[in-house]
Amino acid sequence: MEFYDIVIVGGGPAGLAAAASAKKNKIDKILILERDCELGGILNQCIHNGFGLHTFKEELTGPEYAGRFIKEVKELGIEYRLNTMVMDISTGDESENGSNDKIVTAMNRTDGLFHIAAKTVILAMGCRERARGALNIPGYRPAGIFSAGTAQRLVNIEGYMPGRKVVILGSGDIGLIMARRMTLEGAKVQVVAELMPYSGGLKRNIVQCLDDFNIPLKLSHTVVDIKGRERVEGITLAQVDEHNKPIEGTEEFYECDTLLLSCGLIPENEISKTACVELNPVTSGPVVNESLETNVPGVFACGNVLHVHDLVDYVSEEATAAGRHAAEYVKNGGDKSDDGKEISITATGGVRYTVPSTINTAQMDDTATVRFRVGAVYKNCYIAVYLDDKQLQHRKHPVMAPGEMEQVVLQKKQLIETENPRTITIKIEEA
């Protein structure tokens, strides 16, 4: 059995940033396990620009952004293994050296099935797309139906054109970006349909990818039928009511040979379940504290495996913090101060969830960033933060939408001033 201080599952932007951060915090035995044939994760197929504005103060493409972290990881001498699939993470038994290390079981063509003992594991597996099977779309199963991410890989990496007449269901960021990409490659994007009464993507992507190319966006619409047996020949859209049920008489037929699905992303947590990590039913990601540590001591999570982010810059920021906290865990032997007060964070009044879910004042830095999403579109409302009955923040926002992540920064000095604090509440209040 091999022994490492930190094993990072995933070599995408989160895993790379976490590894570099841990190395800079004086941890030498670090291993990245990546199932793909190269580091970089999803960024390798995101050849559009818009990355790095926060992290590097300049606009980069996805491969350029990933390349900077890959270069840093290699310069720091961090070990990584490609084409390696992690099968299981065990946290219950003692390892060969008598410690309560985590046992990571993985496999690849070179080493076969092998086991690694790690003092700390960082989960950075990213997320996956919601497939057609989860959408209950009626009709046959002809060729020409792709997830937006699959089409993106076919066009940008493999060099294949999925189709010439395209309809896109879902207005997530990948779907919006692929509407522009397919148009630039010569395809005709007939329409982008969205089930909800608001877009699931960033406002800037709606403007740059749809408005600039005169691609129509139909809100509160969904696919009710797919025509074609061997290949998609067309799809039927219908408007939906407030219960997301199709409204009879609103059907519209669009001739097309390709249907792209951009209907949400799901954090990839099958491996997390093997480690008995508690998952948040709203985000489908791990429940973490202020140190990004899960309910399993020594297991940390960051990036899209934790919750789906808008910007990769925020992923890198979060992963850097996870790497630093994991390094502190290793150096302290897992011991923590019991002097602090653990405060739970409650999402209510229009806020769907928060990350983290708890804050321990002894473990937190001088500030703690809490990220969250709202459940509907709000205009001219306030983000209100309360510590029990005491108001800490009351900040006005002109517009908030589910497609854009929000955040508040909590001050440690405000939290420790209160005697026996119990709950931080974050909610939306009307102006």
Segments from the language model and where they lie:
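Predominantly flavin-linked oxidoreductase catalytic cores and closely associated redox partners
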Residues: 114, 120-217, 224-227, 231, ...
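FAD-site-proximal beta/loop scaffold in flavoenzymes
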Residues: 123, 145-155, 258-309
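Exposed aromatic-hydrophobic patches
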Residues: 403-415
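A Rossmann-like FAD-binding core segment of flavoenzymes
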Residues: 73-106, 183-270, 366-399
